[in-house]
């Protein structure tokens, strides 16, 4: 699963995504992409599940790019622990996805296969998405 090699800080604030994405809003590598419509927190496990679903649908043909990286540590308290006594320990990593952000890109496969693969990947993600294509 995706996780940063080094971190500057062990724990992070919860945070919110309040504005639209400023960078990563256009296709950079592939001819088809999966663009977010909502703002939400996507975990490393959800990204990996989307990647597996898309590559399985593509039958290992073509190329898939993941344009988001989980760099925010999410902490959690253990079960049946009272409130207070500090913040919980980091459990997993996530990325805050803003509306308009390209999350996955595909190239090297037919259009119907690429669209089907991106639809499968979008079912694994907690954000509403739209499939975009490159027009030359």
Curated annotation (Swiss-Prot):
Any idea which GO molecular function terms this record carries?
rRNA binding; structural constituent of ribosome; tRNA binding
What is the annotated quaternary arrangement, including any partners? Answer: Part of the 50S ribosomal subunit.
Which keywords appear in this protein's UniProt record, sorted alphabetically?
Ribonucleoprotein, Ribosomal protein, RNA-binding, rRNA-binding, tRNA-binding
Q: What is this protein called?
A: Large ribosomal subunit protein uL16
Sorted alphabetically, which PANTHER family does this protein's record hold? Answer: 50S/60S RIBOSOMAL PROTEIN L16, LARGE RIBOSOMAL SUBUNIT PROTEIN UL16M
Query: Sorted alphabetically, which NCBIfam families does this protein's record hold?
Result: rplP_bact
Task: Write out the GO cellular component annotations.
Answer: cytosolic large ribosomal subunit
Q: Which residues form a coiled coil?
A: none
Per the record, the GO terms for biological process are: translation
Q: What does this protein do?
A: Binds 23S rRNA and is also seen to make contacts with the A and possibly P site tRNAs.
